[in-house]
């Protein structure tokens, strides 16, 4: 990717982050409760983690930012080499995806069942930054400084369940589907989406 496209990609990501922050601040004027969560993601293409802020607009509806980091590992697998008596990785790739989503959580049964059990639906939409590092470059800094990047639209839908405790901490788990398609193929592949499982830990509630 040439320098112009790289600068444009960075600009779009920064603009997306600013837009999410502005929407979060404006929504906080009407929010009943704020929370900050850590997410741990397990996907069919790898794994990841993320940060999620949640602000309730109504008792059963929240809005917030959903920032994720995906380490793509779908085509990698270990192979035993008897000559050196060690395992080596075949098909190693250095692909990172950074979705920057605006997220809505809808709690259809809020106030209708036990308060410590909260099913919800999630909808997330926003830009995704894809970074393809050159695995043939051994230097970590050079590998990522020369990486190709591109911006694509992304999104998620899913279901989850919050398990509230007597403290402010909450554990949750859920299932969902990611839409992660890139315009230009990365290692001959465009679609890195699919099903995912996530675990969520609420680190702070205001």
Per-region residue spans from a language model:
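Gram-negative (and chloroplast) outer-membrane scaffold detector with strong preference
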Residues: 55-139
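Membrane-embedded beta-strand positions of outer-membrane beta-barrel proteins
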Residues: 36-40, 63-67, 102-104, 119-125, ...
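Short glycine/proline- and aromatic-enriched beta-strand/turn motifs that initiate or cap beta-hairpins
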Residues: 29-70, 200-206
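Outer-membrane beta-barrel "beta-signal"
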Residues: 101, 105, 191-206
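Residue-level signature of outer-membrane beta-barrel architecture
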Residues: 53-55, 106-108, 161-165, 201-203
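Sequence/structural signature of outer-membrane beta-barrel proteins
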Residues: 35, 45-47, 72-74, 111, ...
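Extracellular loop and loop/strand-boundary signature of outer-membrane beta-barrel proteins
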Residues: 35-39, 86-92, 141-147, 182-189
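Residues that define the transmembrane beta-barrel architecture of outer-membrane proteins
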Residues: 34, 45-49, 59, 94-100, ...
């Amino acid at each position: 990717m040439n320098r112009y496209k790289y600068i444009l990609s960075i600009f779009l990501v920064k603009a997306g982050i600013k837009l999410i922050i502005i929407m979060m601040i404006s929504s906080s004027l009407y929010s009943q409760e704020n929370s900050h969560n850590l997410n741990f993601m397990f996907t069919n293409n790898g794994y990841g983690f993320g940060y999620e802020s949640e602000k309730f607009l109504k008792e059963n509806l929240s809005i917030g930012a959903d920032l994720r980091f995906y380490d793509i590992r779908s085509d990698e697998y270990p192979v035993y080499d008897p000559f050196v008596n060690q395992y080596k990785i075949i098909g190693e790739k250095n692909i990172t995806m950074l979705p920057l989503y605006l997220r809505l959580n809808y709690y259809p049964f809020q106030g209708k069942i036990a308060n410590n059990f909260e099913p919800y639906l999630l909808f997330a939409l926003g830009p995704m930054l894809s970074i393809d590092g050159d695995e043939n470059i051994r230097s970590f800094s050079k590998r990522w400084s020369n990486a190709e990047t591109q911006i694509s639209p992304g999104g998620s839908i899913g279901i989850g369940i919050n398990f509230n405790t007597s403290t402010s901490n909450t554990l949750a788990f859920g299932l969902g589907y990611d839409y992660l398609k890139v315009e230009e193929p990365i290692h001959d592949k465009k679609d890195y989406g699919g099903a995912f499982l996530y675990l969520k830990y609420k680190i702070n509630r205001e």
